[in-house]
């Protein structure tokens, strides 16, 4: 069929465009599109001529002029389709307005005021239609019954119906309104439900009026009977889901629930045909039988039971209850009638086969029951029933014959289609993929099926197609290497099949030729080759001769004895030729397999290379842990609230490190790559971070350094000291160099002393602008405060220390030491002691030096007169000598913060007892002895630490011991090594005996009191110097024995985003190297290496290939091939190792150069230098928060177990966020605070009296501090707030100071005369001389 009707030549695109237009037009009616395709296939196969195609297309596209005219383009000349104007088409309905619908409902309500049943029934019908429980046909039918005597309402109701063919098929105006309504329902029921005039057993409404309509339908049916038969036989298709045999011309769904579909169908077909089809005849017969069962049930049951029966059927039709449940419910009603129950079960079987049957019966039964219940209409007479029964039987008999004939004609048409085009959706289902073929479907008989095949092979269950032509199954994408292997396999298979076929044919031809030569076969009768050679043998012979195969087969069949020898020679010739070709191709195929096998197995490397760079980016790694943290944030907040907002440890990421030896390989890789990428100076810094920080986190033993490495370290540290930028991460990072670096700093303390004196005399504005100088001043005053507390507590034993609570936190959180380690150009370092972040100033001592805790407490030191102000606001008198001594001490400890000495003992002792601690009296030992004991107590810990650090060799141990001797000779010993190494008696004889200004104040004795001229009582004067002896650490963060043991086996580090990415990259590198090591030693890897000529260690070969890639000896392609050969299919993650290592080293360089990262390293080494019993995780965390107030903080912990476990947690600051660190304080407010508010004026002067020396010695021989606090319990918990603007002081609620003195028992008077005389003398002395 050539498109001659068009001026220009048609192309394939024109045909595709037309098909797309047809498909779009009938997207909701897929059957029409499929039928159009079937018409085109029939024309292509010459089953239908051009005229037949035109006829079918006109029928299919009726109502769509654009499609019909567009089809003319593809018709030859002389076959154009001409359209005639269609007469009698009803005009389009006017759109119904909402106000009209409201008016119509109100009219119904007004009309039936006296009968609310009609109005409620009308609303129920509409609601059921809205819920898709009723079709539009059922709605019209029931409304017509309700408005039986109100024709005007029924006519008006038809205007609200969808624009379907039902409304278009209403008869002329001459017919009465009642006849029009009944005719409409009659015609619609032919499509969806049985005709209402066949409602046997129920009342027939106005049968006389229906007779003209039936007659008209009957005449029309006779006129179109032949045409329908022809079309039904030709166009029959089994795609209808509701009935097996449906008229092709109607193309309507059996239920027709959707008004839109009915409207669309009416537009396509013009109008619903008024005649019934032959399929309806069989349906009517079945319908009458099923309805008779319902009538029988109605006769047996009363009204209520029958209503219950209909309700059960309704529930079953809506699939609310199952069939067994329905049988159980109905059995309770009609179970006493066995024959009726059996008929009902058969009725259910028929309902399952025809889904529209039950709904139609329910509609008829409900309508009839409704009318009969009202009693308005009389029952039909028995004579009318008999007449209707005879007429019905005659009509059904004719229809049965017609249906049988139609089925026979359709069987030859529809079952000729392939199974893939059948609609098996209603057939029995075995699995989601298999359906049972219909019983009347002709099954092809397999010719070569054996007995076993008949038992096991399937002929009735077919696999249904899933999807459509728009959705094809997506196979796995093959790479180019697989394509090469597949091509080889195809060629090899083809050649194998040829060889096997030739060998088999040769064998059978030889056997047949032998039989002929030995006269085993009778030569009188012709020999049938098919009896001795199989179909495959004959096909091989035919293929052997190519185009002349058919001629050879004819010769073979005519003269077997002459043709067989020639054919056998040809077969053997081809057999040798193909065998030789096979051996040659085996070598080619083997080479192709060797080159492409491992590459063909690699399906992931291509995508892995594209995504790996994104996954290794800092943004992706941060997003990963943030996503995990956000999921846990809600639960963690609830836990934190329940625990008093304490620190919650719940790792977000956890990793195992099973192979400890792998750290050595990582070290060698990093060192080798750094030599290729970094300069000498960068190499030293990067490797120092690696060895002293990264490896120590994972518990890798320290690496010994050679002489060259030590010289490099000393040079680099000297350069750092000269430039004034000392880093704790570099000075304390390596345990071996800790003492030597400290000595190099101590040697420069005298030269730096003057610089720090000048820093102490600068103005406030200079301090505000210079953070480094401020840090030095704070470090100096912190050390003075430390020495002051050491002297105050000189008479107490370590096991009976006095505990004073310096702070009462509202949320029971831990006390902390916030260390602001500011490594700036000035090389300063700050250590500030503070508690829980709070907005309150807290008095922590009583007496002349009232210490106030501020929420940030990191402000600079100010000078007011001759007093130096610490950040917490304490004024301390400092002499010039003491100032020099203190300055030199700060210089010695600059950049080297080691809290192992008395500083930690006195300020971080943990007390898990009650709030009140009893101050026990010390023995007769003086403060000097206590101080000496403490110095001896502090030395072993330092020696042990130094011995552990220098245990690598005798040379380092000798050097450290020599350094310690130099320290003692120079008299420059800090609290790190000795809390009071010098004798306190020597301090009284020398001007420079005090190591801090606090020491000078607290060594005052009776002679100092006389020189100062103070006349206070002894006890009052002692109380002026009572200070908190130790910082109180709540039991919430106190380490128990179990925690201490776990702390020894773990390393905790708090870092920022940079360190988190560092450890993640380390983990990824470790994981990939471990994968290479594990997979190379797997059984598959051993099998690969055993096949090689020189089997070696697979892992060593891999490392060699990796080093060759890093130094440029080999390229990436060579490295990938080596990895595939050594490791196998899991090697794809190793293809980007060079990029990962380079990224890792660049990140290490960033960490080394970043100032904040160095501060975090310095803080880590500072916390690590504590003794285990004085380490608190919360303290370390709070110190980190001071450094990173607005940044993410990560808790990185490595448990040195087997295997080692690394856990990473993104900490959530929550409500306890530290305030911004203060940098200055108003001088006016500071002067008021210390000169007025904190100043103490003695109430009365102490009278000068004469004391006997023996009495004076008796009182003064004991420690003055213990004398004033004898049997006293003290708790300092009172807190106050001072507004800097108004200087207003307010006390914090629920805080208090307590001082409790336990009463002594009164001594009973001794009856001994001597004791009585002694007491009398003592009383006389007190009355007259005291």
Curated annotation (Swiss-Prot):
UniProt-listed SMART domains: HDAC_interact
Q: Which GO terms describe its molecular function?
A: transcription corepressor activity
- Gene3D superfamilies given in the database record: Paired amphipathic helix (1.20.1160.11)
Q: Which residues form a coiled coil?
A: none
Q: Where is the PAH domain?
A: 8-78, 94-164, 283-351
- What Pfam families is this protein classified in? PAH, Sin3_corepress, Sin3a_C
- Its name, as the record gives it, is Paired amphipathic helix protein Sin3-like 3
Q: Which organism is it from?
A: Arabidopsis thaliana (Mouse-ear cress)
The gene that this protein is the product of is: SNL3
């Amino acid at each position: 069929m050539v498109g001659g009707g068009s001026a220009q030549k048609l192309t394939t695109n024109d045909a595709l465009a037309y098909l797309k237009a047809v498909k779009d037009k009938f997207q909701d009616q897929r059957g029409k599109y499929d039928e159009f395709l079937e018409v085109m296939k029939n024309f292509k196969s010459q089953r239908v001529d051009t005229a037949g195609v035109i006829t079918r297309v006109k029928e299919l596209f009726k109502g769509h002029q654009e499609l019909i005219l567009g089809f003319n383009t593809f018709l030859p000349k002389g076959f154009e389709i001409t359209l005639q104007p269609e007469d009698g088409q009803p005009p389009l309905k006017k759109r119904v307005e909402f106000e009209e619908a409201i008016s119509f409902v109100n009219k119904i309500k007004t009309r039936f005021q006296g009968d609310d049943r009609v109005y409620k029934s009308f609303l129920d019908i509409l609601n059921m239609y809205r819920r898709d429980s009723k079709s539009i046909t059922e709605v019209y039918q029931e409304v017509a019954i309700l408005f039986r005597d109100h024709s005007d309402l029924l006519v008006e109701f038809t205007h609200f119906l969808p624009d379907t063919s039902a409304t278009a098929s209403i008869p002329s105006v001459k017919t009465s309104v009642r006849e029009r309504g009944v005719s409409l329902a009659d015609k619609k029921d032919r499509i969806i439900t049985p005709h209402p005039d066949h409602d046997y057993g129920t009342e027939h409404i106005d049968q006389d009026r229906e007779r003209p309509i039936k007659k008209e339908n009957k005449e029309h049916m006779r006129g179109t009977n032949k045409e329908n038969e022809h079309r039904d036989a030709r166009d029959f298709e089994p795609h209808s889901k509701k009935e097996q045999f449906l008229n092709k011309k109607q193309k309507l769904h059996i239920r027709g629930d959707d008004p839109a579909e009915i409207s669309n169908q009416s537009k396509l077909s013009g109008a619903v045909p008024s005649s019934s089809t032959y399929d309806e005849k069989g349906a009517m017969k079945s319908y009458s039988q099923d309805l008779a069962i319902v009538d029988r049930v109605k006769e047996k049951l009363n009204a209520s039971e029958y209503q219950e029966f209909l309700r059960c059927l309704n529930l079953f039709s809506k699939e609310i209850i199952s069939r067994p449940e329905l049988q159980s419910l109905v059995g309770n009603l009609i179970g006493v009638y066995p024959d009726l129950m059996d008929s009902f079960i058969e009725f259910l079987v028929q309902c399952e086969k025809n889904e529209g049957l039950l709904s139609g019966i329910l509609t008829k039964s409900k309508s009839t029951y409704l009318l009969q219940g009202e009693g308005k209409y009389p029952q039909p007479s028995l004579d009318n029933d008999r007449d209707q029964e005879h007429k019905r039987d005659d009509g059904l008999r004719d229809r049965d014959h017609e249906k049988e004939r139609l089925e026979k004609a359709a069987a030859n048409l529809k079952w000729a289609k392939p199974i893939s085009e059948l609609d098996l959706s209603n057939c029995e289902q075995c699995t989601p993929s298999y359906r049972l073929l219909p019983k009347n479907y002709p099954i092809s008989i397999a010719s070569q099926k054996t007995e076993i095949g008949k038992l096991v092979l399937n002929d009735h269950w077919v696999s249904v197609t899933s999807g459509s032509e728009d959705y094809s199954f997506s196979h796995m994408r093959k790479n180019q290497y697989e394509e090469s292997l597949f091509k080889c396999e195809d060629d090899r298979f083809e050649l194998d099949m040829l060889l096997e076929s030739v060998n088999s044919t040769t064998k059978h031809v030889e056997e047949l030729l032998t039989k002929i030569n030995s006269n085993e076969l009778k030569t009188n009768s012709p020999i049938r080759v098919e009896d001795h050679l199989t179909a495959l043998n004959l096909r091989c012979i035919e293929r052997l001769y190519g185009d002349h195969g058919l001629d050879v087969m004819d010769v073979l069949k005519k003269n077997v004895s002459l043709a067989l020898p020639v054919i056998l020679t040809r077969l053997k010739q081809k057999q040798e030729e193909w065998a030789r070709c096979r051996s040659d191709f085996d070598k080619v195929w083997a080479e192709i397999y060797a080159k492409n096998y491992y590459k063909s197995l690699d399906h992931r490397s291509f995508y892995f290379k594209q995504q790996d760079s994104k996954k290794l980016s800092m943004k992706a790694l941060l997003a990963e842990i943030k996503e995990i943290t956000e999921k846990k944030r809600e639960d963690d907040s609830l836990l934190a609230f329940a625990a008093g907002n304490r620190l919650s440890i719940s790792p977000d990421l956890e990793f195992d490190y099973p192979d400890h030896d792998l750290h050595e390989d990582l070290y060698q890789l990093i060192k080798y790559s750094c030599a290729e990428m970094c300069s000498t100076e960068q190499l030293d810094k990067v490797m120092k971070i690696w060895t002293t920080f990264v490896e120590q986190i994972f518990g890798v033993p320290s690496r010994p350094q050679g002489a060259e490495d030590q010289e490099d370290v000393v040079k680099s540290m000297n350069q750092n000291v000269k430039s004034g930028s000392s880093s704790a991460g570099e000075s304390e990072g390596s345990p071996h160099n800790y003492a030597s670096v400290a000595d190099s700093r101590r040697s420069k303390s005298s030269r730096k002393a003057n610089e720090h004196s000048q820093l102490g005399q600068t103005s406030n504005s200079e301090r505000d602008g210079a953070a480094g100088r401020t840090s030095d001043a704070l470090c100096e005053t912190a050390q003075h405060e430390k020495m002051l507390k050491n002297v105050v507590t000189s008479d107490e034993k370590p096991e009976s220390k006095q505990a004073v609570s310096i702070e009462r936190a509202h949320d029971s959180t831990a006390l902390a030491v916030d260390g602001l380690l500011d490594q700036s150009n000035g090389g300063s370092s700050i250590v500030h002691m503070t508690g829980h972040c709070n907005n309150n100033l807290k008095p922590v001592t009583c007496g002349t030096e009232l210490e106030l805790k501020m929420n940030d407490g990191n402000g600079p030191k100010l000078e007011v007169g001759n007093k130096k102000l610490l950040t917490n606001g304490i004024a301390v008198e400092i002499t010039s000598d003491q100032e020099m001594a203190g300055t030199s001490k700060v210089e010695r400890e600059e950049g080297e913060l080691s809290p192992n000495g008395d500083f930690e003992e006195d300020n971080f002792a943990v007390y898990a007892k009650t709030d009140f601690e009893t101050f026990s009296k010390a023995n007769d030992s003086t403060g000097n002895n206590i101080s000496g004991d403490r110095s001896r107590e502090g030395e072993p810990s330092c020696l042990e630490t130094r011995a552990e650090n220098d245990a690598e060799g005798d040379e380092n141990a000798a050097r450290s011991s020599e350094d310690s001797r130099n320290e003692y000779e120079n008299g420059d010993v800090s609290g790190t090594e000795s809390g009071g190494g010098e004798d306190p008696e020597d301090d009284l004889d020398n001007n420079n005996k005090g190591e801090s200004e606090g020491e000078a104040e607290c060594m005052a004795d009776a002679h100092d009191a006389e020189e100062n001229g103070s006349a206070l009582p002894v006890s009052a004067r002692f109380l002026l110097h009572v200070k908190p002896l130790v910082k109180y650490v709540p039991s919430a963060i106190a380490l128990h024995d179990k925690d201490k043991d776990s702390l020894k086996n773990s390393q905790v580090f708090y870092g920022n985003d940079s360190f988190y990415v560092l450890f993640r990259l380390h983990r990824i590198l470790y994981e990939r190297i471990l994968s290479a090591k594990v997979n190379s030693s797997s059984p598959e890897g051993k099998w690969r290496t055993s096949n090689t000529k020189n089997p070696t260690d697979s892992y060593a070969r891999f490392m060699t290939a990796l080093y060759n890639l890093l130094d440029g000896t080999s390229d990436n392609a060579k490295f990938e091939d080596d990895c595939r050969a050594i490791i196998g299919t899991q090697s794809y993650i190793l293809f980007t190792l060079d990029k990962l290592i380079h990224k890792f080293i660049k990140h290490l360089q960033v960490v080394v150069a970043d100032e904040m990262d160095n501060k975090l390293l310095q803080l880590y080494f500072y916390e690590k230098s504590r003794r285990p019993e004085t380490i608190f995780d919360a303290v370390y965390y709070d110190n980190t928060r001071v450094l990173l107030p607005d940044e993410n903080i990560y808790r990185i912990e490595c448990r040195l177990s087997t295997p080692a476990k690394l856990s990473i947690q993104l900490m959530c600051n929550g409500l306890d966020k530290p305030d911004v660190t203060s940098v200055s304080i108003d001088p006016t407010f500071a002067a008021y605070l210390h000169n007025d508010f904190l100043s103490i004026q003695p109430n009365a002067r102490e009278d000068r009296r004469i004391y006997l020396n023996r009495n004076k010695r008796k009182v003064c021989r004991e420690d003055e501090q213990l004398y004033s606090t004898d049997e006293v319990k003290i708790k300092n918990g009172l807190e106050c707030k001072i507004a800097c603007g108004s200087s207003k002081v307010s006390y914090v609620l629920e805080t208090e100071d307590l001082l409790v003195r336990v009463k002594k028992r009164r001594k009973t008077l001794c009856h001994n005369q001597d004791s009585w005389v002694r007491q009398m003398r003592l009383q006389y002395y007190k009355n007259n001389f005291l």
